[in-house]
């Protein structure tokens, strides 16, 4: 890192780039070359080589550390600052804006050296900021010209001008940079390629005549892309997009693969089906019938000639081709489809079903060839208009094929689309991580640079200290402030411009300067975030001491303690320099400005852990601070050295804590004790600010300032921002905007202030807002006179109230302060608009102003946290995603222009192909606006219909390409955009408790006061009654303590973030810790001074207060842990356990100890008490003795019942009954009347079921007792459902069955299946998860409703009553405006008995409710076209609509779709996913959608790779078999099989519907060849692998496929000859597709994704079950309500609610919200002439075919919300989860594949699969592995050091080796332990045998033993020698002593080693001499494992231990 500091920062680092510099560079390069030998040069670009400094990249701004550029150096060549380029030929140029441009120092175009004046000039022009502006303007103007559809002639010259400017730009760039050879030249930048191509094309089209010019002209559109290259922020975004596309490669491959497979299936199943049409029987003709029959019999080979040559008068071909002979439904372009199978669509009387004519939708919807099938499948996957495809296919092929669609929708659509989502989300996450890390690294580098400045700073320090001593007033109440703004940068993607920051700063300055005049009355109770920042230093007096006390001990840290304030404001790049946090996960959290070492508070990972910040006791904390404002904090300024901080000690003395100088001479001033008012504090704060400013301007300061350039910058920044407003403005503001002229006025002001600022007034205003909203929502059409007058009066009143509120507030606060606050500005804006609107009420066309009143709704946000949050999220996202949105806009623009240029003319010329009356349809590309609308519609996911039109007029290939590009690119960007939105500005932290953390807002205070008042009255009444009646002291005594408690609670509302005392009481604390002022009752609660002292004296103290949400009582004080750093870790762990219960008030302990997360009641064999204790206490009769008499009998009865109820057979029986009774409901369709026997059976069954359920209920009552029964929610559900049955039974018995109420009750029987919920574990789990999410879903739903309300009211204002039109009701056509202009003319027609009718559109905006429905249709993109057409055509009330008269009303819908649909629906997805993640955390990270059983399956899947070493399949002894074996096991064999599979797939794709006989035969033989080949493969493998063949899963799969293929061939022959069942035949052919699936085996990426799917299956199964249950209930409900509805629009003979099957088919379609508008439309018919209420239905007593609009709307809306939002999103949540798990698994350093490899190698060394290997072979084994596990030779030492346990025979177990090797790869870590435990579990599961081998020793011990043995041997030899030589015995004794000393030491080592390895509880293991240590003791790591299901293993361990003892 030091390399980046080579160039000294500061102004002296800039040097001109001269010839000498160039020479020096050349010399360095030469030296470098000479130094290095040739080979090394190749590895030059190695990863570990030096990298360019990312801060000095071209295009970035110069970092602040370099200070200002001397003016003479601007735009001049300078030497490169980046050390990386020290030996590269480059130089840099800086412009005025300090942007870095880097150029190559070689000659440009071989002639211009860097010193050439021409090149210098070019460079000056290029880097000038205006140059970019010019190009930008040119591009934009050019874009405007491009949007013209028929440009006039003079535009040609304009074109030339543009081309000229672009050419000039490129020339400048080429002159300045060079063309293409060196780095940093023109063509080295990909963005310049774009320019180059654009210009070349411009010239080419000009001078060369190329024919189709319009196609080439479209290339000009790419100029719009140049905007991207000009705006710096966009480049990064585009980079990000490209990154995420790269990431998508795997998913794309999988998607294409799956779609191909499904398309092949579709091809086989539905080939040619969609051409079946209903043909009219020809004129009566006997020969025809013969022909027809022969036609059907020979249908496979008819050639189109007439069949019967004898009859030539009838030409079948011509007859079929004539369209008029087909059956058309009215209004349809395509003939009615039909099918020949029993469950397909039938033809009307007189028609037969024949395959003829073209396919539907211009012939583009079909499965006839692979390509069309693929398109259809792609359409299914993107779910665009798929209901149409679904209905056509089911009609033509039969309802059974619904299964195909279910599979494709669930596996294809939901799964694949969401996988794309998951991948994109992950790409984003990774990018965010990367930017964070980069920022961290930068901070470290800067820290080093700052150290270089240390010396300069120290000099400045002395001067500063002296200066501070001169100025007495320098000290302030809380530091002098440069106010940091890090909250604005808190959003991950935010790149707010410095301008904004400066403006904010400017506001603050004004505030501060005016602050001197601020008077006491201007106390504001509720301030927004902004004003909080303005209030300056949020830390309290003591807090500041705490923060800065230890700071000066290490001088170089001081500067960075102000982490973001110095550097961030001027940077424009995405991650501002210091805006990140080191170890804290949440960006922008509490201690951004504390040093890492001396962090004020321990960094806690959870944001909810509140901080203990003692607050200044004179200052009320402003109320409405939201989450973000915590991140915005005040920062004390740095006088020159940045080291002087002021602190206030406990006596109120302000001292300057600076370097030693400041400490030794503490200059301070006593704050007056207890008298300072809040205002004075504030005043003092602002005045001190002035002092600091004057101080800085003092001339004597200048020298010191020049010492450290960094500070110069900061100060300049201050002065600049201060001078933004000239001083005269402040004078003016003080004079005119602050009103405090005379005493009486001040008194008035004071009174007004008291009134306006009172919480009750706030409450009243809020109520007014709600009422006003209601009034606006009550408008409807048609309204009576009185009603509208009431509304207008109401509006006047509300306008008056709001105006009054505004004026009073202005009086109370002074205009200056009033407009300092965001909400007030907002109010002011709305009030002035309302007044304006009153003035302009009579002017036509300004009714739009009325919709501005709607913005008042947003005032609710002030007191409604979730709404506030939503607005913030949208605000943040719009800001943060500004760049992305821009990219999207550019893309939309480009495609709109391309569409217009390419297809505009064709639409005009070929319009008759797509429109009956040869008028341009609504969706065309002839003009730019319409082209834009089409592109927008494609982005909404509706591309297929417009594409058909396009293909019809402009040719298939071009249209397909353009539309697919828009679809993929646009949708990817949109998806990216909203994902980024959700990821960056949305986490449930802000959802759950936005405002809990801050002081209660005024509403809560007001409500609290009311509550208090009510309590007080209640208490007084109670006391009075007790005094009057019960004159007992005791009663009073009982009340007293409670009362006290209440008082305490009320008087002190503690708060999460800070412990603030006495909020309402505004008292002050004087120096001695007593309280003066109001509220002595609070004295007990004042935190004692000593607490603060402990803070101050021990800065390392931290307090963590874990809190449960939503509780704000003082009890939180008891949970604090005052702890020093030493026990911090522990409390952190505790916290992580407790704070995980976010969102609930109950802490669920970590489930680690083995208890289930849901604590179920203990299974006791005794029933519980019948009644609750309270009941027993009040009614003595409830208490029965169970010891004797009747009581005992009763008790025994209960015990018996309990046994019955608890028996699992009982439960099974009940479940069976529930299923039967639910099944019975499915039979009650419209045909039940005709099937009398079934009807009577059902009636009896119904009674039986009811009795059984009543019996069950009674049994449970007796067994469980009422208390237990009625406290269980599931029991309540049972109870209510049984009640319904009971009531209807009694009603039937009494003969009231025909009553309306009873009938509607009967429909409630549809809820019966709900009882199955509690019985099926899987569904119950999901429902619990859902219920957990309901609060936050409801919250967001409410917010969305408010949001939509605005659009709805706006819609009512714009369109109410304007959708009426006059139609001819026989033809259904609308009269033209020329014929009928208005209502009265229509009436005239009606009266003259014409067939006319004045009719409304069914879904309209006549009132707010219908408005909501319309908006829902628009948001789900279903039925939105009709609504939009009506809106666009509308003129005025009672006027006949005119085609596209009101064209720009489209924009209303576009805006709604963006905000109402994209934002709010995505927000839902965000909330749901987030919620489930939170619940998951709460349940200890397990999946909340799985039952225990399924979790086991899931874990098994996860551990799939854990295989035990298998015996390799032995090579057969037989010579022939051996040869085959060798051939089959070669890799070539596998690869060739794969190639064959691919070829087979291709041949299957070639098949088409209308292929010739010849082709069919060829394909038949090819297929035969493939079958033979695959059978051959199968046989070869069987020969060589013998019975082992079936041990491998894939082989079994292959085998089955081969068998099916062979059987299929024979069956196909049989079926063709004997049976005519084409479906069966087709299904059998599908078997061939199975072969393709074998490809999966080969592709790793696809395997990962499918693995993720496999892992999601259990959870998805549960969710699927729940979805089925919901569908079932709704189907039955639909059958009982809508069975007889008129068949029109979406309801017809196949898709209706008449039978259970049909209902399910319809509901499945709506699950994806497809086509629900069509099903709803007929149900909205409420009376004639739309439907006939008296119509008879044969065979049924029901009359009429009208629907019930209210029931229908409720039915569909609720179903859509439940299924679409909930289920689909749960699906998403599960997939995202498992996808990340699967990718993590594949991304870990050791994947399953590595373990497989380990075992494969193992098999060679351990052929008998003993699981052990001899120690001598270990070295070879380690060398034989592949990396990363490989340990190359020489590896003996490493292996010995691994200390592996050995068993007798010097053998080592494979697991131990694997552990040791993985440890080597992963390093020591917690993960390692987890992995080890996991592997051991897997192993134990598969090999119980392992335990029996007891290790005796380890490799290390073995080595030590060997060494010891050698030592002993040597000693003994020496001893013998000594004996022989007969030396003096004393020497011998000495020697002996040495040996004795030696051995014990060795033994100690061994013992230590053993203990080190053994687990804590087994430390009593004795040295190895007594008995072999247990296997566990040698292998287990230090950390104890807590696996509950491994109890048997533990027991074994215990036995071993006991035997040792």
UniProtKB/Swiss-Prot annotation:
Region annotation (Binds SCN2B) ranges: 917-918
Glycyl lysine isopeptide (Lys-Gly) (interchain with G-Cter in SUMO1) crosslink, residue number(s): 38
Residue ranges, compositional bias (Basic and acidic residues): 511-529, 596-610, 1933-1964, 1979-2005
Residue(s) carrying Phosphothreonine: 1943, 1963, 1966
III repeat spans: 1190-1504
Region (Disordered): 28-61, 494-529, 591-634, 1120-1166, 1933-2005
GO cellular component, one term: axon initial segment
Site (Binds SCN2B): 909
Site note Binds Mu-conotoxin KIIIA, residues: 330, 362, 916, 920, 945, 949, 1374, 1429, 1443
PTM entry text: May be ubiquitinated by NEDD4L; which would promote its endocytosis. Phosphorylation at Ser-1506 by PKC in a highly conserved cytoplasmic loop slows inactivation of the sodium channel and reduces peak sodium currents.
Keyword Lipid metabolism tagged: no
Intramembrane segments: 370-394, 928-948, 1409-1430, 1700-1722
Localization in the cell: Cell membrane
Pfam families named among the record's database cross-references: Ion_trans (PF00520), IQ_SCN5A_C (PF24609), Na_trans_assoc (PF06512), Na_trans_cytopl (PF11933)
PROSITE patterns (UniProt xref): IQ
Residue positions the entry lists as glycosylated: 212, 285, 291, 297, 303, 308, 340, 1368, 1382, 1393
Site label Important for channel closure, positions: 1489
Recorded family membership: Belongs to the sodium channel (TC 1.A.1.10) family. Nav1.2/SCN2A subfamily.
Known partners and oligomeric status: Heterooligomer of a large alpha subunit and a smaller beta subunit. Heterooligomer with SCN2B or SCN4B; disulfide-linked. Heterooligomer with SCN1B or SCN3B; non-covalently linked. Interacts with NEDD4L. Interacts with CALM. Interacts with TMEM233. Interacts with the conotoxin GVIIJ. Interacts with the scorpion toxin BMK M1.
Protein name: Sodium channel protein type 2 subunit alpha
Organism: Rattus norvegicus
